[in-house]
Regions:
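Glycine-aromatic micro-motifs
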Residues: 1-160
Length: 160
């Protein structure tokens, strides 16, 4: 089976939310073949995109020195890529990019697929995520034991 590595830093970390989306679309659930906590260095998690479908700000990553984004490095089968692309809003809202991440064990993993908001859709100011949306991220950050200061940052974000 062909597989690929996917780094998710937003709501797609939440398997239940992802499963609900698949069910709503009539798709089989996306199977997480392997999951590791990973960090994307020199990037910052921000909310500068407004999602019409969620009616709130949603996550994006921006290059930012001395900052890190924590998320999940997930191994997926190639057949699930089409579902991830649709869920991510590719190519109209988010684009695919290959990044390098480090696992908590210190291993550098190169050529990992992630998604970033397309320039035309990025806003200049903070788009407030809903309490529900940010809870998806916080709950998984706690479950996977992200650093305390990162969870504190997530909790400090202004929501609607």
């Amino acid at each position: 089976m062909k597989t690929f590595n996917y780094f998710t830093y937003g709501s797609n970390m939440d398997k239940n939310d992802l499963d609900r989306w698949c069910q709503k679309k009539g798709y089989d659930e996306i199977k997480f073949l392997d999951v590791k906590v990973a960090v994307l260095e020199s990037f910052k998690l921000c909310f500068n995109y407004f999602s019409i479908s969620r009616n709130c700000g949603t996550s994006n990553i921006m290059e930012f020195k001395d900052s890190n984004v924590y998320g999940l490095l997930i191994k997926l089968s190639e057949k699930d890529k089409i579902k991830i692309r649709e869920k991510e809003g590719y190519p109209n809202y988010y684009f695919e990019t290959l990044i390098n991440v480090k696992t908590f064990e210190g291993n550098l993993i190169k050529g990992v697929l992630t998604y970033k908001v397309i320039k035309e859709k990025e806003k200049k100011d903070h788009q407030q995520p809903s309490k529900y949306y940010i809870s998806l991220i916080i709950n998984n950050a706690e479950e996977y034991e992200f650093p305390t200061e990162y969870i504190r940052y997530l909790r400090s974000l202004e929501t609607k």
